Amino acid sequence: MILANDELKRLISLGRLKVEPLAPDTVRENGLDLRIGGEYAIYAYEGAVVKPCELDSARPLFRVVKADEVVIPPRNFVLLTTEEYVKMPDDVVGLANLRSTLARYGLVIPPTVVDAGFEGNITIEVVNESPNTIVLRRGMRFLHLILVKAEGRALYSGTYQGQRGVTPPKGLRGEC
């Protein structure tokens, strides 16, 4: 069941769902609109051979940029972080979607689940499929998070729990 505006506000008022900072236009009809944070990550090298199964961390492959503008080159991608620090209830799952206006410029994100019990800034991959450089601004609403009630409870305890700022991917050594 998708949670609507009144239920989202109720969960926030009870402290079960936390969104900090909480702007007046964050809670929407059927989800949360989240803003671009103050940093992003982009690959530091072009043409490198990346072998996730041999990495403990991919952080050295990325350059973290602190800026008020996010520059996304044509047919490239960046990792964006939300301005908001989110704490999900243990029985609610988030489904992340790019706001449709940005998709109309040629930006896309992969299907992304924010697990029940997750806490942290959300890092999301944004791909520019267009032939043009696209520049986004810090603080603009970019991510629409649909919240869905889960059957039962879960507690997320993964690598990205408690992340602050943009977080490059973990390595997959030992998982392949």
Swiss-Prot record:
Function summary: Catalyzes the deamination of dCTP to dUTP.
Taxonomic superkingdom: Archaea
Assigned EC number: 3.5.4.13
Protein's pathway: Pyrimidine metabolism; dUMP biosynthesis; dUMP from dCTP (dUTP route): step 1/2
Species annotation: Pyrobaculum neutrophilum (strain DSM 2338 / JCM 9278 / NBRC 100436 / V24Sta)
Gene: dcd
NCBIfam families referenced in this protein's UniProt entry, alphabetically: dCTP_deam
Pfam families noted in UniProt: DCD
Positions of dCTP binding: 99-104, 115, 163
GO annotation (BP), single: dUTP biosynthetic process
PANTHER family: DCTP DEAMINASE
Protein name, as recorded: dCTP deaminase
Reaction(s) catalysed (UniProt annotation): dCTP + H2O + H(+) = dUTP + NH4(+)
